[in-house]
Amino acid sequence: MRNRIWIIMVLFSLLLSACEKWLDVKPEDEVDANVLFETGQGYRNALNGVYNNMAEVSMYGKEMTWGAVDVIAQLYSSFTQVTAWSKMMDYAYEDTDTKSIISSIWSDTYTAITNCNNLIEQVVGEDPDVFVLGEMERNLILGEAYALRAFLHFDMLRLFAPAPAVADNRGYIPYFEKHGSLAEPYLSVDSVVGRVERDLLRAKDLLATYDTVGDNSSALLTVYRLNGDPNPFVDIEDLFFFYRGYRMNYYAATATLARVYDYAGRGEEACKQALEVINATGVNSNGGARKQCFTFTEVVGITIVETPKLHDGVIFGLSSSTLIDDYKPYVPEGGGGNVTRLRVDKDAIYEKSVEDQRAHLVTTEGYSLKYQEHRGSDAVDDLIPMIRLSEMYFIVSDYLYRNGKTVEIAKDGEINVKDGIRMLNDVRFGRGITVHGQISNVDELEDAIIREARREFIGEGQLFFYYKKYNKKPVDKMVYYFPLPDNELIH
């Protein structure tokens, strides 16, 4: 592996505006790693480069969210022309076009992992005095790098291996932890989960030294986490510490760990991590009581189109300045000439509900507004949601229902006792639904959670993994994981 990486040369502005984010930067040069890591700014640039890797169209900027991964979840209506996506919808994974998409997902994800490893190896032994905030900033960068390495490996596991509940002891994917390594042994599903868990626990310990300390917790409230409002607790001249929702913050690592435990069938541990996120609070800059960090976006009727991503509940997201343009060709409103249209069956998904506010985010013809251009001041047009509060509720709901348990949820200074059904209904209520169907067994609960996932995660690449986790199929021919790219079969 060459000791050179693409990095982002960042020009920080001293004045914060609504469209300025630490992540809004462009690649300009290739710099030797020895030069890059001479300064604290170089470490920041290297970390930023990983996030930019992840936002590329071959990864979460398209294929691993609203592209291929939502296609194989059967989210979209049938395509009228033969394309790579129409072949993926039929699980024709041996086709040349689909192989190309799968290969790019694999190779670009492992490239991002390589960049994580380079950063980790460099920052571990670095003198804290190199960083503006010393040890605290060093821990922050290292914690994010560990968490991102775990996050990326976990998605490779979800895409290229069977679910833990049905997995055998075969090796499915490698887990790279050393920069420069060209090959690592292929590990079993359980072994990969163990390494992901270890990296996330490391990350939580490191990130806690910044995100949960004193007034820093205020940065995880929505107005600062995603909207970027001026924060009286943070130096306004240093944008590196703004927009924690666009970075792998402490609660993003916690939510990822909840996702991992849930996928692995470790319900009690998943519930514990998810509840930590649900109950998270931050310092209120107005001097009042602490506020919930993550909430369900409050909207009234059609005004929901001003907040199409319902971002108050987004725990972690990526920034893509080209997201709207990348999405335009696939919807009539974009005026693009692409023959592929990403249309969903609105009536089937929302069951003609007059209450579900998410239904306003899909046009009558079935096109999602989530990644189209918006005029609302809080539209966060560049945001690609990666982990949501609703997922944490689904995790807790599942565990409580299966085990006949209840938990205490703190909200607005009050403690409420919830069981599994109430946790699921809280998501529905948060989206405007007041009438809920009956659930009488685990199978019906799983079906109900899948229905909510279809409504909640349009364009976010998560629905497929609910089918996989519950071993259910929207179509009989669904295949639960990709074959390895051809160039990996030599291992």
Model-identified regions with their sequence ranges:
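Bacterial Sec-dependent N-terminal signal peptides
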Residues: M1-E28
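Conserved, well-structured interaction surfaces
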Residues: R44, T83-F160, L182-D190, L206-L207, ...
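Alpha-helix C-terminal capping/termination sites
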Residues: D155, P162, D229, Y263, ...
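Alpha-helical solenoid repeat scaffolds, predominantly canonical TPR units
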Residues: N115, V192, D199, L206, ...
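Hydrophobic-face positions in mid-chain alpha helices that act as interaction patches
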Residues: T209, L221-I236, F240-Y250, D262-L389, ...
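Membrane-proximal, proline-rich intrinsically disordered regions
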Residues: C19-V71, S320, I421, N425, ...
